Swiss-Prot record:
Encoding gene, per UniProt annotation: TMEM40
Native source species: Homo sapiens (Human)
Record field: transmembrane: 160-180, 187-207
Protein topology in the membrane: Multi-pass membrane protein
Name of the protein in question: Transmembrane protein 40
Localization: Membrane
Biased composition (Low complexity): 50-70
Keywords for the protein's UniProt record, in alphabetical order: Acetylation, Membrane, Phosphoprotein, Transmembrane, Transmembrane helix
N-acetylmethionine: modified positions: M1
Bias-annotated ranges (Polar residues): 1-14
InterPro entries, sorted: TMEM40
C-alpha cells in the first residue's frame, strides 16, 4: 500500500507540473500574440501616417507649382501690356525728345479713328469739307459741287428761287386771263406753270443757272449805285 501511494504521488506531482507548464506556455503564447498584434498595429499606424504626410506634401507641391505658374503668367502679361502702351505712346511721339514730329502724332490717330470701315469699294469715308462721300465715286465732281455751293450759297429750298418761279406763274396767269377772260382757266395755267418750273428748277439745275445769271448782274448794280451816290463839289 505504501509503495502504491508513493508511486501515485510522483505521478500526481508530474501531472501538476505538466499542467503548470502548459498554463505557462499558453500564457507566453498569448503574450507573444499580443506583442505581435501591437507591433502590427504600430506598423500600420506608421504607414498611414507616412502616406498622409506624403499626400499632404504632394498637395502642397502642386499648389506651389500652380501659384508659381500663375505668377509667371501675370509677369508675362504685364510686359506685353507695357509694350503695347509704349508702342501706342511711340506712335504719338515718334521722336526721341518726347515731342510729336511734324505731320505725325494725333492727326494720324484721328485719321485712323475716322476710318469707318475696311477697304470695301462702297465704304463711307470722310472727305474734307464736302462731308461723307462714297469711295469709288468721283472725288473731283463732289469737290466742284461743294465749291459751287459755298460760292453761290444755294439751297434747293431757297426762298428767292421760289419767289422767281411764283412770278413766272403769276405772269402766265395774267396773260391767260387777258386772252381768255376766264379766272378758272388762268389759275390752272398759272399752277401748271409754277409746278413745271419747280420740277425743272430743282431736278435739272435751273436754280443754279438763275443764280449765276443774277449774280452776273450784281456788279453792274453796284457800279450804278456807286456812280449815283457819288458826291459832287
Amino acid at each position: 500500500m505504501e509503495t502504491s501511494a508513493s508511486s501515485s504521488q510522483p505521478q500526481d506531482n508530474s501531472q501538476v507540473h505538466r499542467e503548470t507548464e502548459d498554463v505557462d506556455y499558453g500564457e507566453t503564447d498569448f503574450h507573444k500574440q499580443d506583442g505581435k498584434a501591437g507591433l502590427f498595429s504600430q506598423e500600420q499606424y506608421e504607414r498611414n501616417k507616412s502616406s498622409s504626410s506624403s499626400s499632404s506634401s504632394s498637395s502642397s507641391s502642386s499648389s506651389s507649382s500652380s501659384s508659381s505658374s500663375s505668377e509667371s503668367n501675370d509677369e508675362d502679361q504685364q510686359p506685353r501690356a507695357t509694350g503695347k502702351h509704349r508702342r501706342s505712346l511711340g506712335a504719338g511721339y515718334p521722336h526721341g525728345n518726347g515731342s510729336p514730329g511734324p505731320g505725325h502724332g494725333e492727326p494720324d490717330v484721328l485719321k485712323d479713328e475716322l476710318q469707318l470701315y475696311g477697304d470695301a469699294p462702297g465704304e463711307v469715308v470722310p472727305s474734307g469739307e464736302s462731308g461723307l462721300r462714297r469711295r469709288g465715286s468721283d472725288p473731283a465732281s463732289g469737290e466742284v459741287e461743294a465749291s459751287q455751293l459755298r460760292r453761290l450759297n444755294i439751297k434747293k429750298d431757297d426762298e428767292f428761287f421760289h419767289f422767281v418761279l411764283l412770278c413766272f406763274a403769276i405772269g402766265a396767269l395774267l396773260v391767260c386771263y387777258h386772252y381768255y377772260a376766264d379766272w378758272f382757266m388762268s389759275l390752272g395755267v398759272g399752277l401748271l406753270t409754277f409746278a413745271s418750273l419747280e420740277t425743272v428748277g430743282i431736278y435739272f439745275g435751273l436754280v443754279y443757272r438763275i443764280h449765276s445769271v443774277l449774280q452776273g448782274f450784281i456788279p453792274l448794280f453796284q457800279k450804278f449805285r456807286l456812280t449815283g451816290f457819288r458826291k459832287t463839289d
